[in-house]
Amino acid sequence: MIDKSKKTIRILFPQWQGGNQELYGFGARLLHWLSPESCSSLHTISVPEFNPDTPEPEEGLLYRRQLLSQHDEAWAVLEKEEPDHIVVFGGDCLVDQAPFAWMNTRHNGEMGVLWIDSHADVKTPRDFTNGHTMVLGNLLGGGDPEFASKVKTPVAPSRVMYAGLIEEGLTEQESSVISDLGLQIARPEELYENSDRITRWIKEQNICKLAVHLDLDVLNPDVFRSLLFAEPEPEFDWQAVYPVGKLNLAQTLRVIRDVSAETEIVIIGITEHLPWDAWNLKELLKKLPIMNE
């Protein structure tokens, strides 16, 4: 049942700079188009067109100034609207920083975070130049120092749980952060049949408000193709270097529905949607004879 006393907003955040990939913006817009109609207001964050000529990193981070500007624009929307619930259509994973940080401050640092992702997202600029690999680290007070300074109330480590994380793919730095902070992990294999590992954590931590980060790369690329790791004929073999997701759509939906029965979900951020087939068809259509008349 919809609680009409709650104010929900939608944020369309077609950010691509955090992953340096053009399809992130296209994927965000397609996500919004695919979503059910809603009376909620839509707020679109201004994002420049993709730059095919990758610049030098700025203090270790690609497109640092643009990413900070977009973060601040999203924060300004939240400050003005003061929503109870937020839906985010991304975009790379970094789009979730401003909404998660803002909502955690609103709830006095007591918000829980369910990070549904095959990757840890706790790197630093010393480890990588793409900002989307640092977003959870930023929210915890680590990651990139400048982005972390934007987080008024860091998320408490005990109130964070990974769902679907592939531990075999963790770097030494990522493993160290997870171990040092004591971050909880529900492995893919623990989620194939039920969500008990996560619902127990919600009860143990007495989490009344929960933000859900859904990185679509938690899905198995053999069953869901709109992912970085399902790129047709890739120039770079992503699957040979980075861990790929193991869940399917039904399992992922069941996890989210199960946790929503235990607590109030205040944010759902959906990220990393790379619809290769739709993009390639779009590129074909614009090159056909008489199509542009």
What does each model-identified segment do?
Residues 150-185:
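Hydrophobic, aromatic-enriched interface-forming segments
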Residues 85-159:
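Active-site histidine-anchored catalytic micro-motif
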Residues 124-127, 147-150, 171-178, 223-225:
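A short secondary-structure junction signal
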Residues 143-144, 165-170, 245-251:
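A general structural motif
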Residues 123, 168-170, 276:
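Active-site environment of divalent metal-dependent phosphoester hydrolases
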Residues 115-118, 140, 162-167, 187-189, ...:
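Short, structured patches in soluble enzyme cores that scaffold and shape functional sites
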Residues 2-88, 95-109, 177-293:
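Catalytic cores of soluble, metal-dependent hydrolases
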